Amino acid sequence: MERTLSVLDYAVLVISGSDGVQGHTRTLWRLLERYGVPTFLFINKMDLAGADESALMTQLSRTLSAECVDFSAPVSERDEALALCGETALEQMLEHGAVTDACIADMVEQRAVFPCFFGSALKMQGVEELLAALDTFTLEPDYPDAFGTRVFKISRDAQGARLTWLKVTGGTLRVKAPLTYDAQGKTYSEKADQLRLYSGVKFRALDEAGAGSVVAVTGLSHSYVGLGLGAEAEASAPLLQPVLTYQLILPDGADAHSALTKLRELEEEDPM
């Protein structure tokens, strides 16, 4: 999960209205802060008995950030709360009595405010408002022209083909483009044989992927999670560390070499 955060432009953190902020919620919040991901909050299951919007907003402000603002409230109340989160918003409130959408989008992008929405995903309550806010209060990142990508996942398809999942962070990645990188003390020069744009288990092959695209690439045999290609630097060590260790005891007659090969694949896919 942490590996994915490094390639997100924005995040929606879903919190149970019946449970409130839990330990894992705080962990996710720290990770989002570490990677500087602008975040919207959706407090779900508000249709259940005992879900108290006012109490939840107080908890969010105290445990996560004082910049959590209720966007389900009337616009006037929302803007008054926004005025406490930034000088530009305060100036707009004093001069015009309202905060512009552009100002709010800038504040969200700078993590100066965290919009909160309440509803029920099961009953589609509050979902439309959240989607509208994502459309209104998000900004398209400005990517550099210099080519760069960040690897965040390794997996294999149903046929066993090795997939390198990456985000293009600058320039354009083209199919069959040569990619040079260092791994395990050696330098490798390989080609991006296929660029796949996935939707569920289905994918569409691309000729090229522009900056901001997330694609799965075949043809890279030694890529690894956190690898930076081109102008992109290698990712820093993850914050989360495993707290449990496991021992695998093979049954009599098992092929240790085959087991090791499979374990190496698992290690690639989940290096933690």
Region roles according to the model:
Residues 1-272:
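Structural and coupling elements of P-loop NTPases
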